[in-house]
C-alpha cells in the first residue's frame, strides 16, 4: 500500500515553523497541568479516606480522639470510599456539561482567554478543596461537592480550547501521528501528577494539592501571555489555504486556462474582514455532522473505562494487593506510558492507511484480551506493570485518538470548510459525551466493587469496550470496504 504523500516526500516537518513548535508545547503542557491536578485527587484517596474516618478505624491519626471524632465525616472507610466515588461522578457530570458549553464559548471568544481563565480559576478551587480546608480543619460534604462541581466546569475549558488551537495550526496531513503524539499530554499530566503527589505525600495530602494547584496557576499565566491561537494572528496563512494548495498541486491541469480563475483564490491572501466573517456553527448543526454521534456514543463507553483506570488504579493497587499508596501511585504511571505509545503508534498507522476506524477496531478487540489478562495479574509489581502497559496501549491509545485526531477530523470535514469555527464545538460534543459516560461509570465502579468485588468491575470494563466497537461498527465496515476497493484499484493499475 502506498504511503501518503506527506510521508513519501518527508515534507511533514518542513511545513512547521518555530511557532508550530511553541503552540504544540504550550497546549501540550497546559492540558498536562490540568490533568495533573485531577490525578492528584485519585492519588491521595487513601490518605483522604483515612483523614475522613474516626480514629477507631484510623490508627494513623495522632490527634486526640475527642478532637478527631468531632471532625470526622464518615463512620467507616467504606463510606468514605463511596463518597470519593460520588465526588468523581459529580466532577465528571459537571465536566461533561461544561464541555458542551465550553466548546460553544471557545468558538465565539478568544481561545487564549478562555483557556487561561479556566486554568487559573481551577487552580484556586483545587487549592481551597485540598489545602485550605485541611489547614482550617473544616470538613463539610456539601462544600466538597460544590467545590468539585465548580472545578469540573472550570476544567472543561481546557480540552476544547487546546484541540481547537492545535486544529488551527496543524492540517490534515500527518494529523494522526501529530495528534497521537500530542494527545499524550493527558498521560504526561497523569505521570506528572503522580510524581508530584508521591513526592510530598509524606508531609500530608494537602501539600499534594498545593503543589499541583500552584504549578497549574503559573501555567495559566504563561498561556495568557504566550499562546497564539491561530496562524492568522501573526499574518501567516491558515491551514485551509495550505490544504487547498496541497490538493491543487496534485490535480492535473488538463483544462487549460479555465481552471486558472477557479484556483486563483486559493493563493490569495485574505484580509482581516474576510476572516472575521466566518461564523461558528450551531450545536445542533455540529451534532448532525457525519460521524459525530457514532464517535460520541463510542467515546462515552471508552472514556468510562479509561477514566476508571485514571481515577481508581492507584486505589485498586493499594486495596487489592496491599501495596503502599506512594508505590501504587508510581506503578500506575505504566498505564499512561502504554497510552502514550499506543496513541502515537496507532495515529501513525491510521495516517498510513488514511483511515481511523479499522485501527480503532483492532486495538479495541485486543483491549478485551488485555483486560482479561490484567484482571488476573499476580501480586508481582513487574508483571503487573507489564500487563498495565499493554492495557494502556490498547485502551488509552484509542481513547487519545478519538478525543484528538478524530475530533479534529470531524470538526474540519468538507461540509463545514466555510465555517471553520466548529472545531471546539465538535470537540466539546465528543468529549462531553465521553465524560457523561465516565461520570456514570465512576459511581458504578464504586458500587460494583462494593457489592461484587474487583473481578466484576473488569467484566464491566469488557462490556463497555465491546459497546465501543458496536457503536462505530458502521464506520468500521465502510472504511474497511473503502480500503478493499482502493487495494483492488491499485492492483488493476499495476
Swiss-Prot record:
Pfam families: MFS_1
Coiled-coil annotated spans: none
Gene Ontology MF, one: xenobiotic transmembrane transporter activity
Database matches in InterPro entries: MFS, MFS_dom, MFS_trans_sf, Sugar_P_transporter
GO CC annotation: endoplasmic reticulum membrane; lysosomal membrane
Signal peptide: none
One GO BP: xenobiotic transmembrane transport
Residue ranges of the TM segments: 16-36, 81-101, 113-133, 147-167, 177-197, 209-229, 297-317, 333-353, 357-377, 386-406, 428-448, 452-472
Family (UniProt): Belongs to the major facilitator superfamily. Organophosphate:Pi antiporter (OPA) (TC 2.A.1.4) family.
Subunit note: Interacts with ATRAID; the interaction is direct and both proteins are mutually dependent for their stability.
Function in brief: Unlike the other SLC37 members, lacks glucose-6-phosphate antiporter activity. In osteoclasts, forms a transporter complex with ATRAID for nitrogen-containing-bisphophonates (N-BPs) required for releasing N-BP molecules that have trafficked to lysosomes through fluid-phase endocytosis into the cytosol.
Name of the featured protein: Sugar phosphate exchanger 3
Amino acid at each position: 500500500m502506498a504511503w501518503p504523500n506527506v510521508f513519501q516526500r518527508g515534507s511533514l516537518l518542513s511545513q512547521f515553523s518555530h511557532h508550530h513548535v511553541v503552540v504544540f508545547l504550550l497546549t501540550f503542557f497546559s492540558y498536562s497541568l490540568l490533568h495533573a491536578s485531577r490525578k492528584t485527587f485519585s492519588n491521595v484517596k487513601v490518605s483522604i479516606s483515612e483523614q475522613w474516618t474516626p480514629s477507631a478505624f484510623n490508627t494513623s491519626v495522632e490527634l486526640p480522639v475527642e478532637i478527631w471524632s468531632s471532625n470526622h465525616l464518615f463512620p467507616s472507610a467504606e463510606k468514605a470510599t463511596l463518597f470519593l466515588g460520588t465526588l468523581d461522578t459529580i466532577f465528571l457530570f459537571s465536566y461533561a456539561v461544561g464541555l458542551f458549553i465550553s466548546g460553544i464559548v471557545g468558538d465565539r471568544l478568544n481561545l487564549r482567554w478562555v483557556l487561561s481563565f479556566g486554568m487559573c480559576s481551577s487552580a484556586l478551587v483545587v487549592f481551597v478543596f485540598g489545602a485550605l480546608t485541611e489547614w482550617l480543619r473544616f470538613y463539610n460534604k456539601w462544600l466538597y461537592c460544590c467545590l468539585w462541581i465548580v472545578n469540573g466546569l472550570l476544567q472543561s475549558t481546557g480540552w476544547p480550547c487546546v484541540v481547537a488551537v492545535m486544529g488551527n495550526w496543524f492540517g490534515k496531513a500527518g494529523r494522526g501521528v501529530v495528534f497521537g503524539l500530542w494527545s499524550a499530554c493527558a498521560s504526561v499530566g497523569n505521570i506528572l501528577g503522580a510524581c508530584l503527589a508521591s513526592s510530598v505525600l509524606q508531609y500530608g495530602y494537602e501539600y499534594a494539592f498545593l503543589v499541583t494547584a500552584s504549578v497549574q496557576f503559573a501555567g495559566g499565566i504563561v498561556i495568557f501571555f504566550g499562546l497564539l491561537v491561530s496562524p492568522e494572528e501573526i499574518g501567516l496563512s491558515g491551514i485551509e489555504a495550505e490544504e487547498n494548495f496541497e490538493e491543487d498541486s496534485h490535480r492535473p491541469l488538463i483544462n487549460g486556462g479555465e481552471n486558472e480563475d477557479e484556483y486563483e483564490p486559493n493563493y490569495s491572501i485574505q484580509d482581516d474582514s474576510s476572516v472575521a466573517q466566518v461564523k461558528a456553527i450551531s450545536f445542533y448543526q455540529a451534532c448532525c455532522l457525519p460521524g459525530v454521534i457514532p464517535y460520541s456514543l463510542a467515546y462515552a463507553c471508552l472514556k468510562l473505562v479509561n477514566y476508571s483506570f485514571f481515577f481508581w488504579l492507584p486505589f485498586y493497587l493499594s486495596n487489592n494487593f496491599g501495596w503502599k499508596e506512594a508505590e501504587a501511585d508510581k506503578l500506575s504511571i505504566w498505564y499512561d506510558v502504554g497510552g502514550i505509545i499506543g496513541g502515537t503508534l496507532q495515529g501513525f498507522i491510521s495516517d498510513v492507511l488514511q483511515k481511523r476506524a479499522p485501527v480503532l477496531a483492532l486495538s479495541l478487540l485486543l483491549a478485551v484480551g488485555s483486560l482479561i489478562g490484567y484482571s488476573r495479574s499476580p501480586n508481582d509489581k513487574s508483571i503487573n506493570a507489564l500487563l498495565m502497559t499493554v492495557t494502556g496501549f490498547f485502551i488509552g491509545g484509542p481513547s487519545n485518538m478519538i478525543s484528538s485526531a478524530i475530533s479534529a477530523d470531524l470538526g474540519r470535514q468538507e461540509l463545514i470548510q466555510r465555517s471553520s469555527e466548529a472545531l471546539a464545538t465538535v470537540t466539546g460534543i465528543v468529549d462531553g459525551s465521553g465524560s457523561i459516560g465516565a461520570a456514570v461509570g465512576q459511581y458504578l465502579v464504586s458500587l460494583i466493587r462494593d457489592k461484587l468485588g474487583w473481578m466484576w468491575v473488569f467484566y464491566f470494563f469488557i462490556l463497555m469496550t465491546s459497546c465501543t466497537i458496536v457503536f462505530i461498527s458502521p464506520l468500521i465496515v465502510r472504511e474497511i470496504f473503502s480500503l478493499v476497493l482502493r487495494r483492488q484499484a491499485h492492483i488493476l493499475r499495476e
